Swiss-Prot record:
Originating organism: Oxyuranus microlepidotus
PROSITE patterns: CYSTATIN (PS00287)
Residues the UniProt record annotates as site (Reactive site): G29
Superkingdom of the source species: Eukaryota
Motif Secondary area of contact per UniProt: ranges: 73-77
Name of the protein in its database record: Cystatin
Function, in words: Inhibits various C1 cysteine proteases including cathepsin L, papain and cathepsin B. This protein has no toxic activity and its function in the venom is unknown. It may play a role as a housekeeping or regulatory protein.
SS bond list: C91-C107, C120-C140
C-alpha cells in the first residue's frame, strides 16, 4: 500500500510559515513598535501633551520636543505607549480658556540656562469609533 506525502507536507509547510511570522503578529494584544511619524501616533502624542498640561500643577505650559519611541497594542481600540521629551515654555497658564496643542507648540522656550526638559512615558487608549481618547498612564522625570 502506497501512502501519499501530501497530507503530511501541507500542515508541515503551514507550521513553518507560522514560525517565520514576527512574534507580535502571532500574539493577540501583543505590543508592536510604531513609527514616530505615523499619523495615529502623532494624534496620540498631541493628546498626551494636552492632557499633561491640563493635569500638571506647573504654572507654565510644556511643549513637545520629540517622540523618542512609540509602540501600540490592539485592545478594544488601540493603546499607544509613548516616550516623549517635553520642554517648559515661557507661556504661563492663566485663568480662562486653556491653550490647545498648536498654541502650546508655538510658545517660546526660555533661555538655554533656564530650560527644563522632561522625559515622559504616556499610555493613550484610543477608541476612534467612539471619538474618544484617554490618558491611562503618565510618568515624567
Amino acid at each position: 500500500m502506497v501512502h501519499s506525502q501530501l497530507p503530511v507536507a501541507a500542515p508541515l509547510r503551514l507550521l513553518c510559515a507560522l514560525l517565520l511570522l514576527p512574534s507580535a503578529t502571532m500574539i493577540p494584544g501583543g505590543i508592536s513598535p510604531r513609527s514616530v511619524t505615523d499619523p495615529d501616533v502623532q494624534k496620540a502624542a498631541e493628546f498626551a501633551v494636552q492632557e499633561y498640561n491640563a493635569l500638571s500643577t506647573n504654572a507654565y505650559y510644556y511643549k513637545q520636543l520629540r517622540i523618542v519611541e512609540a509602540q501600540s497594542q490592539v485592545v478594544a481600540g488601540a493603546k499607544y505607549y509613548l516616550t516623549m521629551e517635553l520642554m517648559k515654555t515661557k507661556c504661563a497658564k492663566t485663568t480662562g480658556k486653556p491653550k490647545v496643542y498648536k498654541e502650546i507648540q508655538n510658545c517660546e522656550l526660555p533661555p538655554k540656562a533656564q530650560q527644563e526638559k522632561l522625559t515622559c512615558h504616556f499610555q493613550v487608549w484610543s477608541r476612534p469609533w467612539l471619538e474618544k481618547m484617554e490618558l491611562t498612564k503618565m510618568s515624567c522625570n
